[in-house]
Amino acid sequence: VISGDIVLCHSRGLIGACIRWAQRHDYGEIYSQYNHIAVLNKDMGNGDWTVYQAEARGVTDYRLLSTIAPGGKYRVISLPKGVNKKRFIGFLDSQVGKRYGFMSILSCAFDMVLPDMICLRKSDTWICSGLVAAALVFGGFEAAFSWPDFYTVVPAEIAESCSINA
């Protein structure tokens, strides 16, 4: 477990359950078990880490890993091979303080029902998976080059592209 590793989260709340349910149609049970995604930032020395994530307050880098999936679970996976870690982390650092993409969440919901027909998002805003997807693109993750719109990538899509196993 090192800085830059990706954290796939499964929380217990209603919003998390809705995200998992919506992803299940396109990504199946294995990948759709995750409803939030973050990236390890700094080791706190006590077994906990701070994480980069997009949350309702915007993009942050100070929340503790132990707090981001309340009542649920998380899985840490290595940054995919071939990703330039310096560029990946550099991109995340540059986005700290940007606002949350509430319109992108709405756009994701429309995409699941009416693929590529309605695009709703505001520039300089992020959802959790869009932030990580953009960082992966910036870091040179080749599998990400096939994503038609990294602003509306969902956690299951990243899990699938990173070829995680159940």
Language model segments and positions:
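Cysteine-nucleophile amide-bond enzymes
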Residues: 1-166
